[in-house]
Regions:
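Conserved S-adenosyl-L-methionine
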Residues: 116-126
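Conserved SAM-binding loop
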Residues: 1-90, 103-108
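Short acidic/glycine-rich loop or secondary-structure boundary segments that cap or lie
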Residues: 88-90, 127-130
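Residue-level detector of flexible, active-site-proximal loop/helix-junction positions
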Residues: 38, 125-128
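Acceptor-substrate binding/catalytic loop of class I
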Residues: 90-110, 123-124
């Protein structure tokens, strides 16, 4: 959120009151607790919306995309990141309570169905795809799958929030 402040007023929204409290304690006073499925925001309010690794957690992703379309100004930008490819589904998806992974074509179809115009779609970390796939296959074949713990259980140093 700190980085985005140079572009204008930043409002953070999270369904978790703990996350909102963390942001407020970190100096981000414009934060609110709300569900992405029904945002307490007027139509066409934002020129830039970021939703980074959130959509895959929500049961009704279409409702959320319609909400984003509603609160985004005409010619505004919505920046989304989501995990890719169902065949990469793994323990981390279960731990993080993901509902799905997307292909670019699946995500584009949903965005268009919500009335959004797509400027650009790409896969991040595409070079790591073969390594990730091979690693997961190897662990599954050799039985070396170690049970993962939630990354949210660990306490991280405060300075990491400023990177």
């Amino acid at each position: 959120m700190s980085y985005l402040k140079k572009f204008g007023q930043v409002i953070g929204i999270d369904i978790s009151s703990d996350a909102v409290k963390f942001c407020r304690d970190s100096g981000h006073k414009y934060t609110m607790c709300a569900s992405a499925e029904k945002l307490p925001i007027k139509d066409e309010e934002f020129s830039l919306i970021t939703m980074l690794d959130v959509l895959e957690h929500i049961e009704d992703d279409m409702q959320v995309l319609h909400e984003l379309a509603r609160i985004c100004k005409p010619n505004g930008i919505i920046l989304l990141t989501v995990p890719a490819y169902r065949f990469l589904w793994g323990d981390i998806d279960e731990i993080c309570k993901h509902k799905r992974r997307y292909t670019a074509s699946e995500l584009c179809a949903r965005l268009r169905a919500a009335g959004l115009h797509i400027e650009r779609v790409s896969y991040m970390n595409a070079l790591l795809l073969p390594v990730t796939w091979l690693s997961r296959r190897w662990k599954a074949m050799t039985g070396k799958n170690k049970p993962l713990k939630s990354p949210f259980e660990k306490k991280y140093p405060a300075w990491l929030s400023h990177i």
